[in-house]
């Protein structure tokens, strides 16, 4: 026995304080989680570090400890492998059992082992081999123990099951396949007569029913039931309940004035049951419970405590890059908080999660769909029957668990459906995720118009258990608003679950190169969060779309009186429990020139919210101070009753031309700017800046500023339209030099104006020259428009960052305009590939499209320049995000980008969500050009400042 294992044995003996008369004593043989492990002896049969005894941390996945071989579960599909890795693991641990435990019943418990498990104590097999990697199981080892002596625990683990249906259910799957003891191992010591298990049904009226399993009962037993609130100081009467000698019996009692559990108000109680004989406590157990009533009404909805619910949910894997499926309470609490931060109220899995995750869902408030594994194949009836019981027995008392899932996408066994109710006194429904089954339609990845007599056009309650697939930067937030609003029109809509919570990129202990984390290309890079919970842009989109406080769209103009229309989108909570505060922010005039200039608060305060029950819309009013319009944008932050930020909304207080006039620096210069033309070249020249245009193309071919050539060239090229130069006209407007270029095609004309101080103004008029009868000539635009504007070339090399005034800080898509807000955003250059740059994952990404662009200072050393928009609702295109390098054929990383590197656009493309854009909602679709004779055309006005010596002093 190695030193570390021996020390653990001594520690166990020295520190265990056994009180065997009443309570169950829990003795940890492993650590509680992978972040706090214990060390066991270990050997693996094949792969890395195989064939020799060493040590391993428990709990853990052995691959993450440097043993065996990594396998992804689509080994039989895209990965084209003949078979998965099939190594075996051998564990040993010496421990001492105190003599004082003799006469008690001792069981050993495994929280989860992948995949088949045989357990020996002192050389003897303690029970039948366990099959299935996601379930808690136990053995009675009393007869195998030596009390007061050293005992030897041996655990033989097969990564690949000997039962075909287990492999088909768990190991032919779209997830990583690991091996080992990855959840805790512990002993429980109980008196011979004891409460073995309870299954509780606690209703909203305070009534409680519990199925109690007893070991060695007798006629003269009673139970004393106590109820203790986790918060507050209420006291409840202790109830005395007579028992019979049956091993399974149902007890019932009731308390008045209990506080109910729901995800917005997750009130919890400790239920303490004391088993007494002749007035003496024989055994006692405690269970954390919540009082709530579930009502599943077909062709109507799902009700909690009498309220019809809508689940705003996401799917989640139990996963951490350095732990595989071995996680920790810290990670579980963090994950539930992040899910709640997105204003979600529900979560689903592909297998039973860690118990500490369910405990966090109970205490912080999430609905849970708890799933029997079976990715696309089900368990055989014999194996599945045992696993259903193990799953339900462990999870039945969690108030967060509201639905049982049997398998996924065909991975069910109809013979197991009734087994759930045999162990569940609450009679939760059993669904088959992705099927329209037994009155519940959970179809996966619906199109916007799904379907023929289903969803909004059908008669069954519907809640897609997977939708808005998030590969790379796809889905999740992109298109969510359309889908959600469309489905919400139906009274049969009960919610949905997006795929998926986080990228499943695992640390490869067997890799020696620069890459350290593996998501198997696009197969496991589906998260709204990175593997270490880095927030992608869709995180904030979901946060806004699913916020329980919703503002009616409104623009703030000079007539603004401080009022908004606000809807209470909670399920259970009154609007008046929400705290709301505002700030009016002002950008300094030097913002684009001095990186140290910070926005300042003009005025701030609180907004009183009225009484409004869920579903009601009310007018709210904020004070409008005399200096209100001195500010540039308004921020309103809502915080829920628990102190969690709901969202911060922003509104611009002025139009783009106001900001351009305010933010661009003007110098007094006596000398006039000049315009000259020489063959194919027009030169606009001021004292500091020279701009040269090609008269054949209309493109900038050179920008010179104080002996610096700034490579902002080869534009404006039209995007989404065609244009050819017709004529060039030079004029002098006072001290300003003017070049007007008229075009045939989509652009009517572009006017360039050089000011004496070096400022350059560009005004484009497009889509103007419609025919009187036939409308605009289609030869001059490119059909359906998903990209429209102008573009320029600019080298990416040397770019350091940008000071951006507009909506950010994340890039956006046509169908993902929520979750981005007005502000001054300092963005450092990065090359993050969304869902792939795991070694250097910097969010927000730098490259992409930015909405409501107002001003920017592009920092690129000697090539730096500034640009200001006089036009509202303009998108800035800032380079092109790098394509994912590791995706499999058929993956769709992003839509095509326009030519060039820096673009100014009125239309940008949408992002996919598993299905093609044509099957998404309205905001994902391309625009159509509509123009008639007499229209003014579309104007785009920009200011460029290529100067380097602007000094506000």
Write out the residue ranges for each language-model feature.
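Substrate-binding clefts and catalytic carboxylate motifs of secreted carbohydrate-active enzymes
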Residues: 32-51, 56-57, 62-65, 86, ...
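Beta-strand-rich binding/interaction modules
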Residues: 121, 207-242, 249-251, 561-608, ...
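Accessory carbohydrate-binding/adhesion or oligomerization-edge regions at the termini
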Residues: 22-77, 96, 156-165, 230-233, ...
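Accessory beta-strand-rich segments of carbohydrate-active enzymes
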Residues: 24-26, 32-34, 40-47, 61, ...
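Active-site-adjacent substrate/metal-binding segments within catalytic domains
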Residues: 66-97, 101-110, 114-121, 127-130, ...
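Substrate-binding/catalytic cleft of secreted carbohydrate-active enzymes
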Residues: 330, 336-339, 345-537, 541, ...
